[in-house]
Regions:
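Signature aromatic-anchored transmembrane alpha helix within multi-pass, membrane-resident enzymes
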Residues: 282, 333-363
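Perimembrane helix-loop-helix junctions
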Residues: 188-218
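Membrane-interface transmembrane helices that cradle and orient dolichyl/undecaprenyl
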Residues: 112-113, 136, 149-171, 178-179, ...
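Short hydrophobic/aromatic helix or loop-helix immediately within or flanking a transmembrane segment
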Residues: 44-71, 75-79, 179
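Hydrophobic, aromatic-rich transmembrane alpha-helices
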Residues: 266-288
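Loop-to-helix entry region of an early transmembrane alpha helix in multi-pass inner-membrane enzymes
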Residues: 66-90, 108-112, 116, 120, ...
Length: 423
């Protein structure tokens, strides 16, 4: 088994990013649309199609012995976001290690000391960008989607470089099946590319593709069963297969706006490094360049910029964050390409480039990322409950209010009210 390069990078990124995420995690609901998922996680309401991964994340967050239900759900999302950042850093480090000169070249271990700085800088630039930070510290499935994607990318990298083993193929098949079973963003981003790799490896005469479909189907069925079984309500085929195709692809105008938001959050330096890295990957690893290029474009087609809110956007809320995380991979390759041209100054250049790549995403949004309004949903719920008469039947009117009222019922507020189920 190949030795892992820079093993200290993974725990350092996880702990460091987790501290930052915890510092920005709100202690309550920061948006009304999250109330529906929190209520559904305890069986108070039926899950919507495409929200099953959110239910699994919220049930995981409910295990935290800190704060109320919403705060625990936010903390669970923060842990998964930190895991995604650590996996992304490991992916960038492995990619840079794959681009090293041959073993007989006149270079020693000291000539590669700049790699962990570039990998950590790219991972933090993606993980601490505004969209990733906001979605990763709030209740929902976005952080789990990012962790799922990062794990699948890490498993796919050796296969893309024609150096994969059976364990990499099995991991990719299992994660793709899990994504297709529960996630309408990670599913369309993974299983088409995984299917292409499966055909390619099968044509090369590898044996693991013969067993991969069984693992894919088992992961798809198991994840779907785990997410819908606690609800106790019958589900149709559209609900079960919601993760196999996109929840909705928007038009070209929304795509341009989302792409502009992507470049704005990465910053000028990050965007230039990502472009340079894409050219370098096209020359040295075209399959890797195609994989992440497809991921970025498809994620932009599925996602929306952070200004969009509401229950309608919950299923594809991780689209823009997934594009930001995927763009961090060519960013690390571009920074390494630029630093390598400076000879002995590459160590200093790597530190400077990593710092410049992180500064713009971290400063984006100013203090708003640390001061999330958790009073709006609470005041709306309090106002709705105060206006309701005793022992009344309440018609929520909208899906957002339905989730908010059922969230209040989970907390034990106004048990005398009967909430009319929306059809």
């Amino acid at each position: 088994m190949a030795r892992r390069t820079w093993p200290i990078l993974d725990p350092a990124l996880f702990v460091g990013s987790l501290v930052v995420y915890f510092a920005g995690t709100p202690l309550g609901l920061d948006r009304v649309a999250a109330a529906s998922g929190v209520a559904a996680s305890l069986g108070a309401t039926s899950p919507e199609p495409g929200t099953r991964l959110a239910l699994l994340v919220l049930r995981l967050g409910a295990l935290f012995p800190l704060g109320e239900l919403a705060a625990r759900a936010n903390l669970g999302a923060a842990v998964l976001a930190a895991l995604a950042t650590a996996l992304l850093g490991r992916l960038c480090a492995d990619l840079l290690a794959a681009f090293r000169p041959p073993a007989h070249a006149r270079q020693g271990p000291r000539d590669f000391l700049h790699e962990p700085f570039l990998a950590a800088g790219a991972a933090l630039a993606g993980g601490l960008s505004l969209a990733v930070f906001q979605t990763g510290t709030s209740a929902g499935a976005a952080s789990a989607t990012l962790a799922l994607l990062a794990g699948a990318w890490l498993a796919a990298l050796p296969i893309l470089r024609a150096a994969g083993r059976a364990r990499h193929g099995f991991a990719l098949a299992g994660l793709s099946g899990l994504a297709a079973g529960v996630d309408p963003v990670a599913g369309p981003l993974l299983w088409p590319l995984a299917f292409g790799l499966w055909l390619w490896e099968l044509r090369r005469g590898q044996r693991w593709p013969l067993w991969a479909p069984l693992l894919f189907v088992a992961a798809l069925g198991g994840s779907t069963l785990a997410s819908v079984a606690p609800a106790g309500n019958p589900v149709d085929l559209r609900h079960l297969l919601a993760g196999l195709w996109p929840a909705g692809i928007h038009d070209h105008l929304a795509l341009v706006g989302t792409a502009a938001e992507l470049c704005d959050e990465l910053g000028v330096v990050g965007s230039l490094l990502a472009g340079l890295g894409t050219l370098a990957l096209l020359r040295r690893a075209p399959l890797v360049a195609f994989w992440f290029g497809f991921t970025v474009v498809t994620a932009l087609l599925l996602g929306y910029w952070p200004a969009q809110s509401g229950l309608h956007f919950e299923a594809t809320r991780a689209g823009l964050p997934a594009a930001l995380m995927a763009a961090a991979v060519p960013m690390s390759a571009g920074a390494a390409e630029l630093a390598a041209r400076l000879g002995r100054a590459r160590m200093v250049a790597a530190i400077v480039l990593a710092g410049l790549a992180v500064v713009s995403p971290v400063l984006d949004g100013g203090t708003s990322r640390w001061r999330r309004d958790v009073h709006g949903p609470e005041r709306l719920l309090e106002h709705a409950l105060l206006r309701a008469p005793l022992r009344a039947s309440v018609d929520p009117g909208t899906a957002e209010m339905d989730g908010l009222l059922r969230y209040g019922a989970v907390l034990g507020l106004r048990p005398d009210l009967e909430i009319v189920r929306r059809k």
